[in-house]
């Protein structure tokens, strides 16, 4: 059994997830070998003789298919979605294009690979405020709302330090929800209300700044939300578990992003959703491991 803390911008979240997993794994079932990755080569050197990799990784390199592909080459089964799905979901620009093709609502956006490509006419079509975010990344690291062109340019310079590609997205002001999926089945929907204007990194991991609770949406909206979340899961080839983050405005769910390795800390959303379905944290880990082994076996491991 292998647990991982990573080396990307979300290393601290990975460590928190790993610690939570260690605390709740059944020691009678699993031999737990915690391994910390400080650089890419650590994976090949430290993963020898491991029967299964339970990934406590988030963000670039951990959630983008890099680790998954390496483990596949080494013949080591692992938790969560495969390399293809992980890489697609981590790339916001590509995943949004696929969702648009599938008829799923997602905020209008433009992608930049360098500052010189910034088109003011395209910005005017989107209209301020806008959300600026790294094309690859999670936990809302490097994400900010901007209200004018000066703020935009300043933020772009900052985000380009995080990533070589940047997404500029139309800001949708609505009710924030998240939909967790476990083995293709939907768990209870969780709403997110927070003091901060945007559910950024600090808000996600600060229990005092947010109110997260299981909700029952009106029937018609719930049907739309469920359809959108499952369409995302299937279209992006997710497996085992995932979390789909949405904003609901005027009864329409807009998909913000899909997480193939959602947070598993004490304050994370998927464990809260699972608990509302009667699934304890320990049972959730068992289900993730068992389902992952089944999926990897079907993939040829």
UniProtKB/Swiss-Prot annotation:
Pathway: Cell wall biogenesis; peptidoglycan biosynthesis. One of its GO terms (molecular function) is ATP binding. Its EC number is 6.3.2.4. SUPFAM superfamilies: Glutathione synthetase ATP-binding domain-like, PreATP-grasp domain. Mg(2+) 2 binds at residues 257, 259. It comes from the Bacteria. PROSITE patterns: ATP_GRASP, DALA_DALA_LIGASE_1, DALA_DALA_LIGASE_2. Signal peptide: none annotated. The keyword Signal does not apply. Mg(2+) 1 binds at residues 245, 257. ATP binds at residues 123-178. The keyword Lipoprotein does not apply. Keywords: ATP-binding, Cell shape, Cell wall biogenesis/degradation, Cytoplasm, Ligase, Magnesium, Manganese, Metal-binding, Nucleotide-binding, Peptidoglycan synthesis. Its cofactor is Mg(2+); Mn(2+). Binds 2 magnesium or manganese ions per subunit. It catalyses: 2 D-alanine + ATP = D-alanyl-D-alanine + ADP + phosphate + H(+). It is found in: Cytoplasm. GO terms for cellular component: cytoplasm. Residues 96-290 form the ATP-grasp domain. GO terms for biological process: cell wall organization; peptidoglycan biosynthetic process; regulation of cell shape. Belongs to the D-alanine--D-alanine ligase family. NCBIfam families: D_ala_D_alaTIGR, PRK01372.1. Cell wall formation. HAMAP family: Dala_Dala_lig (MF_00047). This is D-alanine--D-alanine ligase A. It comes from Bacillus cereus (strain ATCC 14579 / DSM 31 / CCUG 7414 / JCM 2152 / NBRC 15305 / NCIMB 9373 / NCTC 2599 / NRRL B-3711). The lineage of its organism: Bacteria, Bacillati, Bacillota, Bacilli, Bacillales.
């Amino acid at each position: 059994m292998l647990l991982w803390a990573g080396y990307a911008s979300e290393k601290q979240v990975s460590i928190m997830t790993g610690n939570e997993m260690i605390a709740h794994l059944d020691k009678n079932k699993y031999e737990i070998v915690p391994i910390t990755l400080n650089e890419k080569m650590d994976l090949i050197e430290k993963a020898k003789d491991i029967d299964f990799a339970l990934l406590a990784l988030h963000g670039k390199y951990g959630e983008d298919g890099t680790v998954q592909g390496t483990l596949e080459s080494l013949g080591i089964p692992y938790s969560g979605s495969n390399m293809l799905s992980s890489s697609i979901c981590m790339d916001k620009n590509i995943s949004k294009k696929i969702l648009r093709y599938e008829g799923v609502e997602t905020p209008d956006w433009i992608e930049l690979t360098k500052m010189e490509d910034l088109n003011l006419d395209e910005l005017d079509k989107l209209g301020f405020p806008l959300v600026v975010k790294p094309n690859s990344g999670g936990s809302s690291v490097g994400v900010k709302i901007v209200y004018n062109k000066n703020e935009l340019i300043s933020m772009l310079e900052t985000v380009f330090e995080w990533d070589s590609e940047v997404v500029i997205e139309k800001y949708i002001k609505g009710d924030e929800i998240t939909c967790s999926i476990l083995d293709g089945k939907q768990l209870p929907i969780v709403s997110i209300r927070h003091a901060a204007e945007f559910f950024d990194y600090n808000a996600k991991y600060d229990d005092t700044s947010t109110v997260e609770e299981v909700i029952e949406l009106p029937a018609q909206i719930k049907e739309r939300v469920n359809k959108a979340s499952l369409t995302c899961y299937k279209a992006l080839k997710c497996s085992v578990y995932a979390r789909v983050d949405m904003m609901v405005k005027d009864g329409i769910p807009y998909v913000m992003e899909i997480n193939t390795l959602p947070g598993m800390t004490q304050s994370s959303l998927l464990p809260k959703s699972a608990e509302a379905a009667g699934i304890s944290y320990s049972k959730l880990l068992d289900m993730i491991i068992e389902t992952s082994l089944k999926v990897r076996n079907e993939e040829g491991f």
